[in-house]
Amino acid sequence: MASYGMNDVKNGMKILVNNQPAVIIDTEYVKPGKGQAFTRVKYRLIKDGRTQEVTMKSTDSLDAADVVDTDMNFMYSDGEYWHFMDPESFEQVQATKAGMGGAEKWLKGEESCVVTLWNGEPIFVQPPNFVELKITETDPGVRGDTSGGGGKPATLETGAVVRVPLFVNQDEVIRVDTRSGEYSARVK
């Protein structure tokens, strides 16, 4: 199994921590005035999203995780599994709710996603940065009702709820940023 020395560690690298795949979020090299230099590594476990920090000596190493990021198309959900297909090999995989990582609320069908596979099993799904979804339910915007910040909740066709401006009405299509879960624009 491959491993990384502390000089090779960079943000975004996939590592193995207690037999769990993780991605490095932040690294900080510290050289105190007295004593040996060390590196602080902050990482996020891919499966459950927990963030942890560890301090390592310059002679330590981290094991590389054998994970693969693959572009796949979302096909459908049967309630228990979300089904994805590789557009080149037509290979299909099924992701559980835990493997979806909250991405299920942005997918309605045919979206291109980045699926992280570990031992051939999907452990994390990253939806596209922006999706266009139809508003199925929202209150009508009343003119002059801006004391609460000028926004209102809207339920989308996938069941997700986002805050939208008062001028957006029901049955309109909006663009949503999936990274922050916020309204981005109205689609014509």
From Swiss-Prot:
Key words of the record: Cytoplasm, Elongation factor, Hydroxylation, Protein biosynthesis
GO molecular function, one term: translation elongation factor activity
UniProt modified residues of type N6-(3,6-diaminohexanoyl)-5-hydroxylysine: K34
Localization per Swiss-Prot or TrEMBL: Cytoplasm
SUPFAM superfamilies given in the database record: Nucleic acid-binding proteins (SSF50249), Translation proteins SH3-like domain (SSF50104)
Pathway linked to the protein: Protein biosynthesis; polypeptide chain elongation
Pfam families cross-referenced by the UniProt entry: EFP (PF01132), EFP_N (PF08207), Elong-fact-P_C (PF09285)
Example GO BP: peptide biosynthetic process
Post-translational modification note: May be beta-lysylated on the epsilon-amino group of Lys-34 by the combined action of EpmA and EpmB, and then hydroxylated on the C5 position of the same residue by EpmC (if this protein is present). Lysylation is critical for the stimulatory effect of EF-P on peptide-bond formation. The lysylation moiety may extend toward the peptidyltransferase center and stabilize the terminal 3-CCA end of the tRNA. Hydroxylation of the C5 position on Lys-34 may allow additional potential stabilizing hydrogen-bond interactions with the P-tRNA.
GO CC term, one of those recorded: cytoplasm
Annotated InterPro entries: Elong-fact-P_C, NA-bd_OB-fold, Rib_uL2_dom2, Transl_elong_fac_P/YeiP, Transl_elong_KOW-like, Transl_elong_P/YeiP_cen, Transl_elong_P/YeiP_CS, Transl_elongation_fac_P
Protein family according to the UniProt entry: Belongs to the elongation factor P family.
Main function: Involved in peptide bond synthesis. Alleviates ribosome stalling that occurs when 3 or more consecutive Pro residues or the sequence PPG is present in a protein, possibly by augmenting the peptidyl transferase activity of the ribosome. Modification of Lys-34 is required for alleviation.
Family matches, as HAMAP family: EF_P
Name the UniProt record assigns to this protein: Elongation factor P
Source species of the chain: Stenotrophomonas maltophilia (strain K279a)
